[in-house]
């Protein structure tokens, strides 16, 4: 679709014609490049890597109303101007690279000039060396990072050229530049 077709469908409230639904299962990784209109469905957890910004543009808000009965403000022009219409997200162009270390499986989902996203599946005690800084989020299970207890939802930073001890049964999402 192009900007004009999108704007016309929005004007006609034809949201089902605008988006595509993709089935996902636990553990799937779906890469959506910047500029892709997206939303998540019920039960999904999103690990979104983005540049720091204080702006969010709202395309649609389910016609929800505030306490005064008014629909919340939408930012259609600004949002449409930020979209890339040349992206083919049907391909989900991800080619994971898997590395197995002692008691940890590392899956590198995507690595480009802007960022790298990987996943660690920890199944016991192991040493993990980081060449670059890492932003880490525990997404399943629990365990220890060095002497610190961690669980689902916990985040931590790993400095450049640091070795850490991981122990437990957990899945950790990692991001670096």
Predicted regions and their residues:
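N-terminal non-catalytic cap/leader segment that marks the start of a structured domain
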Residues: 1, 12, 173-177
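Glycine- and acidic-residue-biased ligand/ion/polar-headgroup-sensing regions
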Residues: 1-11, 43, 119-148
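Loop-centered beta-sheet repeat module
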Residues: 9-57
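Short acidic-glycine-tyrosine-enriched beta hairpin
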Residues: 18-31, 45, 144-163
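Ligand-binding loop in jelly-roll beta-barrel domains
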Residues: 35-56, 149-151, 160-177
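C-terminal amphipathic alpha-helical segment
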Residues: 57-125, 130
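Active-site lining segments that contact anionic ligands and/or coordinate catalytic metals
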Residues: 104-105, 114-117, 132-133, 140, ...
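Short, well-ordered beta-strand micro-motif
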Residues: 119-121, 157, 174
């Amino acid at each position: 679709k192009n900007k004009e077709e999108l704007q016309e469908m929005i004007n006609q409230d034809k949201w089902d014609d605008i988006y595509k639904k993709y089935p996902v299962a636990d553990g799937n990784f779906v890469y959506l490049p910047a500029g892709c209109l997206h939303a998540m469905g019920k039960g999904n957890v999103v690990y979104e890597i983005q540049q720091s910004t204080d702006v969010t543009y709202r395309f649609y808000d389910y016609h929800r109303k505030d306490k005064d009965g008014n629909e919340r403000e939408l930012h259609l022009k600004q949002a449409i101007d930020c979209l890339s219409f040349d992206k083919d997200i049907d391909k989900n162009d991800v080619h994971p690279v898997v590395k197995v270390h002692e008691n940890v499986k590392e899956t590198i989902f995507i690595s480009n000039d802007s960022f790298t996203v990987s996943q660690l599946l920890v199944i016991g005690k192991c040493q993990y060396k980081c060449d670059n800084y890492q932003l880490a989020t525990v997404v399943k299970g629990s365990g220890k990072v060095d002497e610190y207890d961690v669980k689902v939802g916990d985040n931590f930073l790993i400095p450049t050229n640091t070795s850490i001890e991981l122990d437990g049964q957990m899945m950790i999402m990692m991001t670096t530049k």
